[in-house]
Amino acid sequence: MLASMPRKLRLEFPDACYHAINRGNYRRNLFEPQGAAEAFETCLFEACAAFGWRLHAFAIMRNHFHLAVETPEPNLSDGMKWLQGTWAMRFNRYRGATGRPFQGRFKALHVEPGHALARVAHYIHLNPVRAKILGAERLPEFRWSSLWWYLQKKRPECLVAETVLAESGGLADTKTGWRRYTDYLAVLAEEDSKRRGEKFGRLSRGWVIGTEGFKAELHRKLTRGNADAERIELLGGDRAARQQLREEAWEKKLRAIAKELRVDLGALPAQKSAPEKVRLAAAMKASTSVSNGWLAKRLAMGEPASVSQFVRRLR
């Protein structure tokens, strides 16, 4: 039942940045009529003004939208509820329809400010290319994107270009600077095509985008200092997000055990069944729900089944 489905992991705190995404119910083309896209863009700018959001990038596609948004106040959920609810009311009134136009609340990935946030903005700006709506050389023509606004003489006050430009080689907010930025996007599009989407594919999955240090800090906030960080199932979230949190918790526990056993994780022997590795694996299996697959990969112990065999011999 829908009522029992877990909600996605989401933290709200001052100055947090997010990659927010939602799709039309049954993947229907909500924004294909120009009026629907224009109405959503209007609601988006109204939401930014009402909730004080700083909008780094957005793209309104045929059946979904992407936002790279910074929230000076911890109000993402309230703002998204207003944005989607207001647009849905106007959408249904315009079409004489009823029901939910979106497939659910929304998905929001935490994004580390700076380089990671700029990468998300590039990903968002390149959405029309990946969707084969137009080629990279015509990207500035796509109307329902922050890139289109950045190229205009006047833009909404909520749009902020500093991070996008600074992390693209320190470009200036000028006509020349934006021309260089669109050239840079064309290069990224070509690289992404060669790698079959691998470069940008991770920017819409999981629950956090950023460095390991940033992920660790969010994990601390999420678990509120609880030593039993494995109780993450209670927090809900999609499968990829839960798995990412599990692995972060296992890594944290492994480091603590290694310190207690005086084992240097950076200088483990190559031997798959080295005593140091087996002791670490045994301690992890005794105190966590760690998988053999994770231990085998993290400690270079060969096949997952080998981990249990090595631990049994130790016992």
Protein language model regions, located:
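Short Pro-Cys-Gly-centered "Cys-loop" motif that presents a nucleophilic cysteine in a tight turn
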Residues: 1-62, 70-315
